[in-house]
């Protein structure tokens, strides 16, 4: 936002220079991007009047003038400006004047005619780039007055970056409030007395979308002269804010926008059919905007309409059909409060970004509309004449924003600032900010002002107190760096160690958004309830993820579309599961997930092209699980997951608790997500694995180990892991190793059965095992398998 320093000082005038003012504004949180003078460096330029203006005898495009600058005689000046004419008040650079660029004015002859000065344009004085003609001053400009003094050119343009939370500073009044608070100076608001209605004319106004438009004010002003010139003082203020003067009506609404931060619009009343209706657009409805472009609207766009058609996009852009033109005599002034959510994103959808939409998207003061429409009415009547009717007010108090009541605790204030500010100072700061303050025992209750809708929680008040008190006034404290023993335990398994192992196995870490497409998430987790964002970045990022698979699979598709068919990626991050028992109704679980697809190895002349399968991913996952020391307690059990292939997937259990899933992506899901070929995924709840089992040293047996192999026939649906687990349990004191080394199906084994060849390693730490003991242990294992799984020894 750009504004004139002198305009700001009309509202509040602290006894500090421009540099100090700019620094103060920056320290207050409104970063100053630049301070530039409004005009170039010049002197010797005064107000003059063209008394005579005749054609140059030797040049078609030059005029010979006699100019009165308040001296003893008239000056002869040759001028080539097309708008030079008799009776015009102008800016005259007299002999001896120095203009920007160190250009000195001297007496000269132009095509044989003497010239004792120069009639100046805005560009020649370094005021603007306008060189279309000489400056035209008001008829009452006093002759001989220094032009710098008359136009108040000893001024600066200050440009600031306004953060989204400080929308109240998108008007002079907001910046002035902050400067007044920081300097304990009075805020001198211009007189904005109500304008008495002199006519009774009104217009029917209906608000059908009260949630989107809680307040809409209108006022009829009749008999205006739309061609009346905008006063030079207003043009200059607008120019110094970067706004070009258009016509008196538009200039007035722009002036109020810059002064109060309240967007306004003026309709040609005679072009409104029936009355004003504030409603949501009809799907596909069109409106021709003031710039001549046609916008096709969606049903979620708020429009200002009459009884037959849309007149403009509410809070963004007016329509051409109802706009003010050179023949307008009667206008309807509009001043409204629109809910920011009803405006946000609509302008960008149509490739627009206007001063109005910029403010409405961030929010305007919901109590400002009366002041703004009275201010605009008075300015319009003073410039264009006419008669004003009464204000038409259509408000819905139930949908207007309510002022926040916030409790500020002394303990919280001192802890966050790190410095004690006296109670009296805290109360004074809050009141100067516009809050209604009630002091309590070590606390304050503050009702935020209507223009500070960013004040919502206790931390906001702490920030405001520190900002106004002055960060530079908070004393530096030496850092307390006492020696603190680390909390790391040997049993802690860091994610960094896990990530390093996955990196060593060829995986690359990715970070995806926690916001995902709800449609894609429903494909992966059908029927699952997700947390939906009330104000998402986009529709495709409007749900919080229930797992990391949504982002990982989207990343795989992205890479496959760029000819990267061999992908190995992993991610660690939070998933967000709605849970009424959790804090704030949402459970956040730290997850570890990975995806692989494509060939097992990079292309190589000595390696066959083999596509990855379930056991490739399972092997990598078991290597990770082995870091926890809990691999022996891990089981892979057949369990349905709608996102995974029913025959090539498993649930992962730690003892009796499920901690994740692994498997091939379901073919139907693979098709819907446009995945190219077999894709395998896994996901683990990491918090259930983060504590590793620390290896315990034990005595190495000095006695020989004995191996015995058995082959048992079991039903096809019996997991081999259960067989191995049972063998370990039965021979707990002597069986030190169990391994599955062969699986056989075929001749000699009945249909629906399989043969598992298992090696048993038996050993004792205190003695050599006798053959009878070994045989008894093996027989015990076989008997246990027979009893539990109906296993039989294979012949």
UniProtKB/Swiss-Prot annotation:
Q: Which GO terms describe its molecular function?
A: ATP binding; magnesium ion binding; phenylalanine-tRNA ligase activity; tRNA binding
Question: Cofactor note, please?
Answer: Binds 2 magnesium ions per tetramer.
Q: Supply the alphabetized keyword list.
A: Aminoacyl-tRNA synthetase, ATP-binding, Cytoplasm, Ligase, Magnesium, Metal-binding, Nucleotide-binding, Protein biosynthesis, RNA-binding, tRNA-binding
InterPro entries cross-referenced by the UniProt entry: aa-tRNA-synth_II/BPL/LPL, B3/B4_tRNA-bd, DNA-bd_dom_put_sf, Fdx_antiC-bd, Fdx_antiC-bd_sf, NA-bd_OB-fold, Phe-tRNA-ligase_IIc_bsu, Phe-tRNA-ligase_IIc_bsu_bact
Instruction: Please report the stretch or stretches of sequence annotated as the B5 domain.
Output: 401-476
Q: Which reaction does it catalyse?
A: tRNA(Phe) + L-phenylalanine + ATP = L-phenylalanyl-tRNA(Phe) + AMP + diphosphate + H(+)
CDD domains, A to Z: PheRS_beta_core (cd00769), tRNA_bind_bactPheRS (cd02796)
Location of this chain's protein in the cell: Cytoplasm
Residues recorded as binding Mg(2+), renumbered to this chain, are: 454, 460, 463-464
Would the keyword S-adenosyl-L-methionine be found if you checked this record's keyword annotation? no
Domain tRNA-binding positions: 39-148
Q: Name one Pfam family in it.
A: B5
- Any GO BP annotation: phenylalanyl-tRNA aminoacylation
Give all residue intervals belonging to the FDX-ACB domain: 701-794
Offer a single GO CC term for the protein.
phenylalanine-tRNA ligase complex
Give the E.C. number(s): 6.1.1.20
**Where would you say this protein principally sits, based on its record?**
cytoplasm
User: Superkingdom of the source?
Assistant: Bacteria
Q: Under which main EC class is this enzyme filed?
A: ligase
Q: Which cofactor does it need?
A: Mg(2+)
Give the similarity note. Belongs to the phenylalanyl-tRNA synthetase beta subunit family. Type 1 subfamily.
What is annotated about its quaternary structure and interactions? Tetramer of two alpha and two beta subunits.
The name on file for this protein is: Phenylalanine--tRNA ligase beta subunit
């Amino acid at each position: 936002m750009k504004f004139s320093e002198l305009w700001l000082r009309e509202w509040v005038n602290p006894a500090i220079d421009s540099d100090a003012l700019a620094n103060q504004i920056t320290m207050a949180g409104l970063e100053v991007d630049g301070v530039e003078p409004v005009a170039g460096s010049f002197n010797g330029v005064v107000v003059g009047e063209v008394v005579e203006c005749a054609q140059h005898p030797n040049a078609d495009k030059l005029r010979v003038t006699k100019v009165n600058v308040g001296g003893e005689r008239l000056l002869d000046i040759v001028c080539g400006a097309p708008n030079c004419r008799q009776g015009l008040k102008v800016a005259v650079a007299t002999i001896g004047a120095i203009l920007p660029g160190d250009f000195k004015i001297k007496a000269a002859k132009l095509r044989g005619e003497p010239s004792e000065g120069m009639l100046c344009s805005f560009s020649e004085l370094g005021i603007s780039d306008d060189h279309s003609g000489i400056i035209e001053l008001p008829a009452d400009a006093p002759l001989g007055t220094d032009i710098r003094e008359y136009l108040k050119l000893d001024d600066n343009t200050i440009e600031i970056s306004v953060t989204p939370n400080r929308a109240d500073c998108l008007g002079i009044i907001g910046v002035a409030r902050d400067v007044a608070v920081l300097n304990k100076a009075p805020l001198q608001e211009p007189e904005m007395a109500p304008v008495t209605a002199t006519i009774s004319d009104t217009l029917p106004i209906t608000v059908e979308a009260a949630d989107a438009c809680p307040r809409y004010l209108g006022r009829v002003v009749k008999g205006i002269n739309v061609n009346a010139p905008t006063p030079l003082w207003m043009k200059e203020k607008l120019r110094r804010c970067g706004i070009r003067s258009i016509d008196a009506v538009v200039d007035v609404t722009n002036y109020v926008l810059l002064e109060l931060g309240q967007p306004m619009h003026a309709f040609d009343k005679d072009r409104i059919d029936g009355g004003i209706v504030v409603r949501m657009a009809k799907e596909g409805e069109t409106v021709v905007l003031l710039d001549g472009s046609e916008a096709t609207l969606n049903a979620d766009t708020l429009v200002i309409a009459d009884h037959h058609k849309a007149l403009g996009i509410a809070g963004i852009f007016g329509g051409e059909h109802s706009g003010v033109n050179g023949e307008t005599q009667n206008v309807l002034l509009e001043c409204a409060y629109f809910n920011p959510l009803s405006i946000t994103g609509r302008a960008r959808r149509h490739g627009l970004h206007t001063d109005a939409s910029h403010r409405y998207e961030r929010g305007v003061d919901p109590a400002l509309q009366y002041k703004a429409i009275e201010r605009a009415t008075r300015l319009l009547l003073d410039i264009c004449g006419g008669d004003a009717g009464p204000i038409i007010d259509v408000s819905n108090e139930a949908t207007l924003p309510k002022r926040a009541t916030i409790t500020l605790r002394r303990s919280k204030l001192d802890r966050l600032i790190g410095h004690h500010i006296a109670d009296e100072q805290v109360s004074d700061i809050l009141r100067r900010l516009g809050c209604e303050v009630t002091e309590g025992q070590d606390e304050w209750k503050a009702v935020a002002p209507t223009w500070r809708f960013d004040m919502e929680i206790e931390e906001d008040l702490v920030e405001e107190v520190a900002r106004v008190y002055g960060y530079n006034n908070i004393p530096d404290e030496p850092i307390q760096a006492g020696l603190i023993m680390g909390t790391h335990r040997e049993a802690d398994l860091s994610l960094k160690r896990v990530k390093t192992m996955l990196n060593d196995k060829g995986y690359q870490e990715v970070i995806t958004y926690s916001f995902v497409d709800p449609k894609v998430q429903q494909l992966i987790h059908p029927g699952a309830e997700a947390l939906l964002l009330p104000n998402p970045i986009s529709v495709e990022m409007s749900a919080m993820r229930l797992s990391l698979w949504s982002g990982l699979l989207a990343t795989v598709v992205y890479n496959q579309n760029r000819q990267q068919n061999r992908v190995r990626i992993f991610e660690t991050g939070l998933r967000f599961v709605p849970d009424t028992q959790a804090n704030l109704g949402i459970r956040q679980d730290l997850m570890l997930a990975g995806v692989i697809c494509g060939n097992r190895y990079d292309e190589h002349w000595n390696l066959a092209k083999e596509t990855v399968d379930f056991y490739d991913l399972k092997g990598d996952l078991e290597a990770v699980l082995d870091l926890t020391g809990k691999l022996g307690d891990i089981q892979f059990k057949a369990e349905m997951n709608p996102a995974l292939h029913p025959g090539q997937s498993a649930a992962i259990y730690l003892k009796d608790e499920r901690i994740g899933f692994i498997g091939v992506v379901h073919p139907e899901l693979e098709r819907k997500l446009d995945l190219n070929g077999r894709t395998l995924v896994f996901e683990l709840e990491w918090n259930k694995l983060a504590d590793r089992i620390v290896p315990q040293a034990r005595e190495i047996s000095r006695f020989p180990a004995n191996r015995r192999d058995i082959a048992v026939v079991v039903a096809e649906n019996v997991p081999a892991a259960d067989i191995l687990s049972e063998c370990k349990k039965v021979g707990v004191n002597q069986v030190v190793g169990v391994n599955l080394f062969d699986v056989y199906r075929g001749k000699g084994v009945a249909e629906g059965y399989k043969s598992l060849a298992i090696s048993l390693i038996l050993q004792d730490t205190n003695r050599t095992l006798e053959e009878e003991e070994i045989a008894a242990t093996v027989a015990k294992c076989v008997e246990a398998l027979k009893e539990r799984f109906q296993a039989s020894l294979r012949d």
